[in-house]
Amino acid sequence: MELRVGNRYRLGRKIGSGSFGDIYLGTDIAAGEEVAIKLECVKTKHPQLHIESKIYKMMQGGVGIPTIRWCGAEGDYNVMVMELLGPSLEDLFNFCSRKFSLKTVLLLADQMISRIEYIHSKNFIHRDVKPDNFLMGLGKKGNLVYIIDFGLAKKYRDARTHQHIPYRENKNLTGTARYASINTHLGIEQSRRDDLESLGYVLMYFNLGSLPWQGLKAATKRQKYERISEKKMSTPIEVLCKGYPSEFATYLNFCRSLRFDDKPDYSYLRQLFRNLFHRQGFSYDYVFDWNMLKFGASRAADDAERERRDREERLRHSRNPATRGLPSTASGRLRGTQEVAPPTPLTPTSHTANTSPRPVSGMERERKVSMRLHRGAPVNVSSSDLTGRQDTSRMSTSQIPGRVASSGLQSVVHR
């Protein structure tokens, strides 16, 4: 039986879960486009979707904020229909064998700081900054980082007067313990500084592959949170960031130095990483690690196909009496064809690749996420699209490789 929402959207299979409610793949019947549909049972103890949809509506129009198509109730469910996005940064991190290159981390950091700044400019803090809540766009927006899931977001100041919420203590931990700020662990009311500190841990997670406080065991959730808190507080920032550019330690030290109601200097933090990016000689071509892996696997498959055709060609030579005694170049001329050159190993020159992708492992990874592959998304998001302002130093048309960077993995979804 076909399930419909709002008399316009067809409900499909479940594709994920958010902080409150489940997410389904849907279809806009009139437009023929795929959408994401978030459902929440109306009988739930603490209904949240209506509040979340209001926050999304307040955020509409911002760069990297998903478009809301429809909100309402349908039968026993509260419903929110949203723009369908691509994979989360956590999905892509796994796709890239749980390690991002410095170039990819810096490209992401620039956009992620801007997303958090935009939310703060709208008088809200996110309170659950983690890789799962940042998604890449699809198609022409395949290089744009989106921020999602406002189920735990909170207003931190009055929209008219900008009066900040009061300082409080003895608060329960809200968010994800792995990325929570130290003040959040200590029970202090969250503010702008905490979103940015969480982002610092996310960036080091991308650098390191894991954080020192991951994998700790405890009998209860509360005890586990305490162990994470202890490990986080006893790990100096310089130790956490050892072996990586000093900008990461500078970023975290800056965030931890902020007072409760301070307005962070977002431009300073962005510039920290932009200066590092330029010193490293990287190019703002928006080719991320996952683009290189996808392209590398594709190139390897092409090489294998050429090699197969070459073998068949040689086999035909050996069976053809007219060409059997001729050298391969001469036999090629006799048939009016050129000899196929042997395949050359793939040697990526971009800073984004940590190692040369092997054909088998690349294709194996691609197969595991085959549901998410989005073929042929061109790299055509300009830097002004990403930051909301024009910056002519960042990218020129000549830097954009044709169709090298497909957005990697398709339509996973809002969590």
Curated annotation (Swiss-Prot):
SMART domains: S_TKc. Residues 301-415 are annotated as: Disordered. It holds the Pfam family Pkinase. Essential serine/threonine-protein kinase that regulates diverse cellular growth and survival processes including Wnt signaling, DNA repair and circadian rhythms. It can phosphorylate a large number of proteins. Casein kinases are operationally defined by their preferential utilization of acidic proteins such as caseins as substrates. Phosphorylates connexin-43/GJA1, MAP1A, SNAPIN, MAPT/TAU, TOP2A, DCK, HIF1A, EIF6, p53/TP53, DVL2, DVL3, ESR1, AIB1/NCOA3, DNMT1, PKD2, YAP1, PER1 and PER2. Central component of the circadian clock. Drug-mediated inhibition leads to a delay of the oscillations with the magnitude of this effect dependent upon the timing of drug administration. Inhibited by phosphorylation. Exhibits substrate-dependent heparin activation. One of its GO terms (biological process) is positive regulation of proteasomal ubiquitin-dependent protein catabolic process. This is Casein kinase I isoform delta. The active site is at D128 (proton acceptor). It is found in: Cytoplasm; Nucleus; Cytoplasm, Cytoskeleton, Microtubule organizing center, Centrosome; Cytoplasm, Perinuclear region. ATP binds at I15, G16, S17, G18, S19, F20, G21, D22, I23, K38. Residues 278-364 are annotated as: Centrosomal localization signal (CLS). Residues 347-358, 380-400 have a biased composition (Polar residues). It comes from Rattus norvegicus. Residues 317-342 are annotated as: Autoinhibitory. Autophosphorylated on serine and threonine residues; this autophosphorylation represses activity. Reactivated by phosphatase-mediated dephosphorylation. May be dephosphorylated by PP1. The modification Phosphoserine is found at S328, S331, S370, S382, S383, S384, S407, S411. The autoinhibitory domain is involved in regulating enzyme activity through autophosphorylation and possibly, through heparin binding. Expressed in most tissues, including heart, brain, testis, kidney, spleen and lung. Keywords: ATP-binding, Biological rhythms, Cell membrane, Cytoplasm, Cytoskeleton, Golgi apparatus, Kinase, Membrane, Methylation, Nucleotide-binding, Nucleus, Phosphoprotein, Serine/threonine-protein kinase, Transferase, Wnt signaling pathway. Its EC number is 2.7.11.1, 2.7.11.26. Residues 301-315 have a biased composition (Basic and acidic residues). One of its GO terms (cellular component) is spindle. Monomer. Component of the circadian core oscillator, which includes the CRY proteins, CLOCK, or NPAS2, ARTNL/BMAL1 or ARTNL2/BMAL2, CSNK1D and/or CSNK1E, TIMELESS and the PER proteins. Interacts with DNMT1. Interacts directly with PER1 and PER2 which may lead to their degradation. Interacts with MAPT/TAU, SNAPIN, DBNDD2, AIB1/NCOA3 and ESR1. Interacts with AKAP9/AKAP450; this interaction promotes centrosomal subcellular location. Binds to tubulins in mitotic cells upon DNA damage. Interacts with GJA1. Interacts with MAP1A. It catalyses: L-seryl-[protein] + ATP = O-phospho-L-seryl-[protein] + ADP + H(+); L-threonyl-[protein] + ATP = O-phospho-L-threonyl-[protein] + ADP + H(+); L-seryl-[tau protein] + ATP = O-phospho-L-seryl-[tau protein] + ADP + H(+); L-threonyl-[tau protein] + ATP = O-phospho-L-threonyl-[tau protein] + ADP + H(+). Gene3D superfamilies: Transferase(Phosphotransferase) domain 1. Residues 9-277 form the Protein kinase domain.
